[in-house]
Amino acid sequence: MNCCFTKRILSGVDDSIPVFSLNNYEGYAKITSVYDGDTFKAVIILHGRPLKFTFRTIGYDSAEMKPSLGMRARADHIHLARLARDMFKEECGFDDRAPFRLWNPFMCRNKVNGLVWIECGKNDKYGRPLVTVYRHKGDKQSVNQKMIESGIVNVYDGKKKDSFSLKI
């Protein structure tokens, strides 16, 4: 492969090169793993190629699976994180214990474990695409909204995080 990089590209100062982003992308995503109630990995088909991303849901924050060791009520916090993770999996129709099935974008969406519709916004501070998740394309209510209405997650606008109420 013949490839030519200019000095400006190699030095990283060429501002004319766009930063890759999924901002405004909409499409199906096949969930491959769920970390907690607001972070998951999924595969999307982009320009005919499967690509895996770590996504962060927009609009809410869930308790952390690994809170700091000195945290007060740490066990309760972990319990709340597991509840949020399990609810997210259920709302997305994802079962990580289900047998692996090959997936292609032409399969019936109701028969694929963890196939969801996503709408991407900008990236968060860690570079993860921020997404609104829908169980099916055309659903009126997003998974994000259902998580917020459940009360086990906090509304989050990307700024200061609220502490979690451990009333379960």
List PLM regions with ranges:
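Small beta-barrel nucleic-acid-binding modules, primarily SNase/OB-fold domains
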Residues: 1-168
